[in-house]
């Protein structure tokens, strides 16, 4: 068995609260989001991992979540790599719009297709497949080799960028990944085999409230 990979979605952001499409826009965490990150950090502290390196996106909500978690686990100075490859899915023309307003403009069925299909992007944006096309190569070149070398790696990112990873790690079909939501601030701990397959997965919290 090789190293450990921990994935955690950022805590609730201001735009999550306001029901806006966020994508690459850059709101910070709400007070609840801060508490979610602290809860996730405490769960990881109790789990007892000491990390070798962390990865996050270039967006504030993921970086803030990571900072809170690192404080909770007692590693505030941990080496951190920030890359837009881990950014949230780009919602294009939907970014910044209220989801109800978008439904009024384009119709509920069309917005549902953009949100929940695997390979149909919104205007000017990315589909989940597009998101995976940048996340997965980055994982293979930058993150996986460290895990296979025995390192313990923490990744704080976004719902769709992490779903792109979970889809491959958990060997989910397109239909299964579209039905999967990741709760904010809830860590997932993967232990990998030497051939990069998953030896075990633990969820440190409640995924039932995911949205």
UniProtKB/Swiss-Prot annotation:
Coiled coil (residue ranges): none
InterPro entries linked to this entry: His_Pase_superF_clade-1, His_PPase_superfam, PG/BPGM_mutase_AS, Phosphogly_mut1
Pathway: Carbohydrate degradation; glycolysis; pyruvate from D-glyceraldehyde 3-phosphate: step 3/5
Alphabetized SMART domains for the sequence: PGAM
Binding site for substrate: 9-16, 22-23, 61, 88-91, 99, 115-116, 159-160
UniProt key word Isomerase: yes
Reaction catalysed by this enzyme: (2R)-2-phosphoglycerate = (2R)-3-phosphoglycerate
Keywords: Gluconeogenesis, Glycolysis, Isomerase
GO terms, molecular function: phosphoglycerate mutase activity
Residues carrying the site annotation Transition state stabilizer: 158
Domain of life: Bacteria
Subunit structure, interactors included: Homodimer.
Job of this protein: Catalyzes the interconversion of 2-phosphoglycerate and 3-phosphoglycerate.
Family: Belongs to the phosphoglycerate mutase family. BPG-dependent PGAM subfamily.
Name of the protein described by the UniProt record: 2,3-bisphosphoglycerate-dependent phosphoglycerate mutase
Organism the protein comes from: Rhizobium rhizogenes (strain K84 / ATCC BAA-868) (Agrobacterium radiobacter)
Gene that encodes the chain: gpmA
